[in-house]
Amino acid sequence: MIKKIQTSLIALVVSVFGFFSVPLSTASAADCSVHIGDFDWDSANIHTAIGAYILENGYGCDVQVTKGSTNPILAALIDNQIDIIFEHWTDNNVQLIDPELESGNLVFLGVNTPASEQAFFVDRATSEKHNITSVEDLAKPEIAMLFKDPENPEKGRLTSCISGWTCYTINLVKLKEYGLDDLYTNFDPGSGGALDAAIKAASTKNQPIVTYYWTPTSLMGKPEIDLIRLTEPAYDESCWNDMMTVVEDIKANGPEVYKPSCACEYKDMALTKLATGKFAKEQPAIIDFANAYTIPTAVVNNMLAYYV
């Protein structure tokens, strides 16, 4: 993905520089070595590719990129094995990241994309035919069977996040709290590409699908993909924090430690950037650039539609 983007990125970078005003450094690669953490979804790949290109060609840095799922990349960042990440879904990892920010081990670098959403979606045709507009509407056996899981045909399938993403465990807890875990599996598609492929296949074959998804993405900008966001209990900070305590416990100790809590919708949020405190002290010019780096959501969607 990064190589594909960088082959035609020069003109894009010229236009992107209109969004920030930090002068390029003349530091040599010997003075600037950057290890960027990247993730296994498209918008993060875009930001990583742009950041890496600018750091290599504008700042003369020696850039290394390590790609992986949320949990191992954030663990590597906390352990100072990675220097910086250019996309972070803040509210999905509050319990993990906030203590690191408070201690100074990590530093917050501002917003990269001002608006995003993540939620449960149903294809429009199924939503309109069966009047499915909320998670409550999923709580009927006959509705669950519309989304039958071929690997567990007694249940419906919620096409969920990848198990290495925090949202996989969030969705697991949500299914339990909404009383849906006896009716639906929390299906791990295996990769972000496989998640996209499942949604595309359902659309092409006119098959029902209930799925977790998010924006910004290239898929949501395609005219043939028509998904309806399901309503959930409104976002509540106290409820969310209680739920995330359970989520982090499950991530650390396994699903058997689940304790009833509460659940609510994902918070629509700005996506952010993080670096280690050590790197911030050593490379203030790079931190100035990273703080200034931000691209409007509509531009990110257009880039994703073009490149992906």
Please provide the spans of the model-predicted regions.
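A bilobed periplasmic-binding-protein/Venus flytrap-type ligand-binding module shared by bacterial periplasmic
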Residues: 118-128, 270-282, 305-306
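Short helix-initiation/N-cap motifs at beta->coil->alpha
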Residues: 39-42, 62-76, 186-197
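A conserved helix-loop-strand patch within extracytoplasmic ligand-binding domains
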Residues: 105-160
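Short, well-ordered beta-strand elements
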Residues: 30-43, 61-66, 155-159, 290
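C-terminal lobe and pocket-closing loops
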Residues: 223-294
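Pocket-flanking alpha-helical
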Residues: 48, 66-104, 217-224
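Short, polar/charged alpha-helical segment
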Residues: 42-61, 173-175
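Ligand-binding pocket segment of bilobal, Venus flytrap-like solute-binding proteins
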Residues: 76, 82-87, 159-243
